UniProtKB/Swiss-Prot annotation:
Subcellular location: Cytoplasm; Nucleus
Top-level taxon of the source organism: Eukaryota
UniProt-listed Pfam families: INO80F
Protein name per its UniProtKB record: Uncharacterized protein C16C4.20c
Annotated source species: Schizosaccharomyces pombe (strain 972 / ATCC 24843) (Fission yeast)
One GO CC term on file: nucleus
Keyword Iron-sulfur among record annotations: no
């Protein structure tokens, strides 16, 4: 008989449990790392969105002021 087959036949329930839990722990660890990576990406995107909104507000205010100044200049002449 093949040595691997003999080894599997001699494997106890405890060995099977240990092997399966080790595999599950590895998978959980991989998924946790992926979650951390996505959390960082989401944080960076949210920060970028806030920055772009702030820049858009500032630009809007600047354009409003320039628009009002042009209207005042046109009214004075």
């Amino acid at each position: 008989m093949d040595p691997q087959v003999v080894n599997l036949l001699q494997e106890t329930e405890e060995d099977v449990y240990r092997r399966k839990t080790a595999r599950i722990r590895r998978k959980v660890s991989e998924i946790e790392k992926e979650c951390e990576m996505y959390a960082v990406k989401i944080y960076n995107v949210e920060r970028d969105i806030q920055r772009y909104r702030h820049e858009a507000q500032l630009l809007s205010k600047v354009l409003e002021k320039k628009g009002l100044n042009k209207e005042k200049e046109a009214g004075e002449t």
